[in-house]
Regions:
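Extreme N-terminal tail/first-helix region
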Residues: 2-43
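Accessible peptide chain termini
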Residues: 1-2, 164
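Soluble catalytic domains of membrane acyltransferases
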Residues: 21, 38, 42-196, 201, ...
Length: 206
């Protein structure tokens, strides 16, 4: 995206398509941009997709710091992401904060699997950004979980890969990826965007 279409100076915040789920306000946006600038982070990569629904995957996920960084990024972009959490975590009082930040409870013991629940949640929204960490854990995970892929495939949504590159302090956007149905080939193509050197703790990303 041309520099003239970005805001936030060195933080390089991309313009977001008008139909994207929004949250926050200009004042909070400026505060988050200032925090990103203060800590040396900036946005790089492709445009933000202009699609009704997407599965946004964030990797590498090796640190508790990924969550506050993600919150700062979402408010700097003024987008509303929807993430999933175990339904028991949404009890009072923690549930208030989790819902405020875009959390949606899912019941893993339900007769409807988590993939089905998530697809139903996304299809129940006019526009949705489903945010997932494909590793499913901060610990070393040689293989990615496949739930995000099945959600995208069953929901007819593109996968939008985003890297938290701690080495370069970049929140990097990659081109949207449309599942082909070849799981192994598609996972390999998606994983090629990410390297251990990007991670906060490289030894915890394979």
């Amino acid at each position: 995206m041309p520099a003239a279409e970005r805001i936030g100076g060195s933080v390089n915040v991309p313009r977001i398509p008008a139909g994207t789920p929004h949250r926050g306000n200009p004042i909070l946006q400026r505060i988050m941009i200032a925090l990103l600038r203060l800590t040396g982070w900036r946005f790089t990569g492709t445009d933000f997709p202009d699609v009704p629904r997407m599965v946004l995957i964030v990797a590498p996920h090796t640190s508790n710091w990924d969550f506050p960084l993600g919150v700062m990024a979402m408010y700097a972009l003024r987008i509303r992401g929807t993430y999933l959490g175990k339904h028991t975590l949404f009890r009072f009082p923690l549930g208030i904060l989790m819902r405020f930040l875009g959390g949606v409870p899912v019941d893993r013991g339900s007769s409807q699997d988590v993939v089905g629940q998530t697809v139903a949640i996304a299809q129940g929204m006019d526009r949705a950004i489903i945010v997932l960490a494909p590793e499913g854990t901060r610990k070393l995970a040689p293989k990615w979980k496949t739930g995000f892929y099945r959600i995208a495939q069953q929901g007819g949504m593109p996968i939008f890969p985003v890297a938290f590159d701690y080495a370069r302090k970049e929140i990097r956007f990659f081109p949207p990826f449309h599942p082909t149905g070849d799981l192994e080939a598609d996972l390999a193509a998606l994983r090629a965007n990410f390297t251990p050197q990007m991670a906060r703790y490289p030894a915890q990303y394979a």
